[in-house]
Structure formats: C-alpha cells, structure tokens
Amino acid sequence: MSELRDTRLEKARTLEELGQGPYALTFSPSHRMAELQVTHADLPKGEERDVSVSVAGRVMTRRVMGKLAFFTLADETGSIQLFLEKAGLEAQQEGWFKQITSLVDSGDWLGVSGTLRRTDRGELSVKVSDWRMLTKALQPLPDKWHGLADVEKRYRQRYLDLVVSPDSRETFRRRARLVSGIRRWLDQRDFLEIETPVLQSEPGGADARPFETHHNALDLPLTLRIATELHLKRLVVGGFERVYELGRIFRNEGVSTRHNPEFTSVEIYQAYSDYVGMMELTEQMVSAVCEEVCGTTTITYQGTEIDLAPPWRRATMHELVQDATGLDFNGFSSREEAAAAMTAKGLHAPELADSVGRLLNEAFEQAVETTLIQPTFVTDYPVEISPLARPHRSKPGLVERFELFIVGREHANAFSELTDPVDQRQRLEAQQARKAAGDLEAQGLDEDFVMALEVGMPPTGGLGIGIDRLVMLLTDCPSIRDVIAFPLLRPESRKGEPPSVE
C-alpha cells in the first residue's frame, strides 16, 4: 500500500510540474450524470451529438487500449463513460492523452468537457476534448467487484463504503428523506419544533444511565440528555399545544445490533390528547412517511413481508403474556407467587424485578416481544415501570401507555401524560430512592419539572419514536450500525477485548 501511495504522490508532483496542479480550487459542471442519461436517452447507438457538456466526478474504473481509453466517472447521481481518443486530445494539446492515461488513477476526482456519443454497445459517453485534475487520490479504492468485505471496516471507514457501495448511499438518502418527511408531516399539522438542552443538570425522561461531564467556568456537574421529554412538557405548560423535537439522545449503555449510545429520536407532545390519540398519530405518520420514502406501505424486512397500512393491531400486555405463557398476572397477589409461576414455566424471574408489575414486564420481554412481527401496539403497562405516565382510567395498577413493536423490536413509546404534580412527585421520589440504592438507570427528582406541573399542564399525549430503528426497517438493514453514518466503535487498539453488548 505504501508503494502505491508513493507512486501516486509522484504523479501529483508531476501534475504540479506540468502546471495542472493535483488539487483544483473550483470546477463548474454543466450537468450531473443522471441528468445527461435521461436527457440524451434517445441518442442512437454509434452516433454523436454536437452538444458541449462538462461533468465532474470520481474515476471509478479505467481501461487503456492503445490509442483509446475508457474511464467511468461517477458523481452522486450516477455515472457516465468517458471516451478518450489520442488523436482528438493530441489535437487540443500535445501530450494530453499520455498525461491523462498515465497520471489519472481510479479514485481521482476529474473534471472533463466534450461532446456526447453513444458507443456501438449502447453506452452513453462523453468524448473528452478537455480535462482537469480536481483532486489526486493518494489511496486506492477497494476492489470494484468485492467492495469492503470486512464489515467492521465499512463502519470505521464509512467514506470508502460510500464510494464503492450504491446500497449504502441509498440507505443514507432514505434516512434523510425519512427525517425530512417526519418533520414535514408534523409541520403541516401545526406542530412546532423547539430545541431543548443537550447539557442538563438533572437527566430525566427515561430509565437510562447518562454520560457525565463538567462545566469548568460554573464548576457544575452536567450530563448529556437521555431524553427530551421533561423540557418539551415544560413547553406544553408554557402554552405550546403541539410541540416536538427530532434530535440526538445519549445513553451510557452497551452496544448491539439494536443499540448505539448516541442515537436519534423524535418526541411529540399534543395537548388535549391521550395515548389512544397518539396511537392514531403514530400509525398515520409512519405509514405516510413509509409510502413517501419507499413508494408503498408493504415492505420486506430480512425476508419477511411487513404491512404498515393502518389500522395496526392493539393488544394489552396482560393479554399477550397470558396467550404466550398461560400466566394470568392479574391473579397473583404477591411477587413471590408470580416469580414461582414464572419459574415453573421456564422463565427467569430476576431479583431486581421486585413487584408483580415488573415481573409481568420480564415475562413479556422473554416470551412475547420477539414474536411481534407485524405492527402491534402493546398497551396498559404496569405503573412501576412507567413513572411519567397517567394512571389507567379503569385498571388499577396500570398506566395509559403503549409501545409499538415491529419485527420483534420496540419502535415507539407513548403515554397519556401524567399531569398530577402530587402523584408525579411521589413517583419521582420512588425513582430517587432506587437511584440512591444503586440503580444507575433510575431517574432523579427534577424539582423544576414538578414545579412546572404545579403551574398546570393540560391533558396531553406524548410519543417517542426511535429514528434509527425506523430507518433499519425501511432500508432492510439488520444492524443499527448500517444506518448511522459514523457509529461508535471500540478503538482498533482494543479490538481484541470482548464486546460490551446490551
């Protein structure tokens, strides 16, 4: 590899000596590749069109055949063949054919001008009359046919992955369209996006361990946000009846194919709504954005057809667990009774699950979650695991909460929001006690948030959707690292250590 780099460095010096320069300042292409292909699709084989064009892009392949050469030049929209003829180039400037064929390598950025012709094989080509080196690449590209076989290298050197993989480029185009589609859908319905703090003195809104940092000037310990929930609710208190934020969240947790410590979510709050209203919003928005991005609401994920057309299935957590295990958690009077019944069914009942409600959630995660392939709203969660949700209007011990599962993964989480400040304080104090006892993921007591609730928050529905997992679904990607341009990876110097997997 070092010999190839040295050779390319020498070519860069030669270009400098010839007055070309290996790194141009600007170039003004007249067309992009896709535009040329569409506009001149009617050009017959073997014919030329006396139309002057200029294009720019990266040289992907090159073939030199005596007095002829053929390069493939690619920009973001597509590619086109360059037809280089010694006689034509030498007529423009002596030595040009030799220079372009000997000094230009695959990977270089090139700007060319010329006319159009279609080869006898039907390939639309630019017959080059003028060329300019835009950037001399010192490193070679991966093999054209095999790309980056090393999956980890694709993540570490995403720029190479994007150069050689049209599928990777399309994944990130779809991600961008999905994000803009969600914002557009919400904006058209009078939701207002407002940015909330990333640095916080009291993290809240989720059960998660935060990243910690320190503000030197104020001598103040801070954390990166683990959710946007509590600040968005403050905005509802302040009078913004439809508000959302789409942005980055940070949780100091393990990594897996479904988890990255830095990820993207959208949280949405709507006054005068509840969790039923947020179910309707979720299925309408996700299906609409899916159709916009994919052209259909029926997609295939890892070989399984998924139908995202509303309405989606709705089922309570109790119903799903009872159907899967035969256990009726409504009939258990103590934690010990529930744990014994779970053990008899071959389910694990961890000591940290210290109530019937927490054990119900454990049974759901072990026996049900991965079976929910088609879109399913799982509703009515135990109050113990939902400290920010409103008590259920008719089911004691439960809250008005749902999670959306597709292909066995959680994609969204929503509540009828808790607006009673006295109840909220009691629940956060219980969380604070768990935190003091060593639960690193328990929430603390945010006094200012409770004060905001005392000012008064109207009935509100709240929703959070994981953007990365939704992109995985719509791009048929098996790992979250495939849809995050630059995922967090262990330093190469520590690659031999066992992975930290959640």
Swiss-Prot record:
* Family annotation (Pfam families): tRNA-synt_2, tRNA_anti-codon
**Annotated residues for binding of Mg(2+) 1:** 403, 410
Under Enzyme Commission nomenclature, its number is 6.1.1.6
Compartments in which it is found: Cytoplasm
Keywords (A to Z) from UniProt:
Aminoacyl-tRNA synthetase, ATP-binding, Cytoplasm, Ligase, Magnesium, Metal-binding, Nucleotide-binding, Protein biosynthesis
Q: Which GO terms describe its biological process?
A: lysyl-tRNA aminoacylation
Cofactor or coenzyme needed: Mg(2+)
Q: Classify the main location.
A: cytoplasm
Enumerate the transmembrane spans: none
Q: Report one GO cellular component.
A: cytosol
How does the cofactor bind to this protein, according to its record?
Binds 3 Mg(2+) ions per subunit.
Q: What class of enzyme is it?
A: ligase
Which molecular function GO terms apply here? ATP binding; lysine-tRNA ligase activity; magnesium ion binding; tRNA binding
Recorded catalytic activity of this chain's protein: tRNA(Lys) + L-lysine + ATP = L-lysyl-tRNA(Lys) + AMP + diphosphate
Instruction: Summarize where Mg(2+) 2 binds, as residue positions.
Output: 410
Highest taxon, organism lineage? Bacteria
Subunit organization: Homodimer.
Do you know which PANTHER family this protein is assigned to? Answer: LYSINE--TRNA LIGASE, CHLOROPLASTIC_MITOCHONDRIAL (PTHR42918:SF15), LYSYL-TRNA SYNTHETASE (PTHR42918)
Similarity remark: Belongs to the class-II aminoacyl-tRNA synthetase family.
The protein in question is named Lysine--tRNA ligase
**What organism does the UniProt record list as the source?**
Synechococcus sp. (strain CC9605)
Show the taxonomic lineage: Bacteria, Bacillati, Cyanobacteriota, Cyanophyceae, Synechococcales
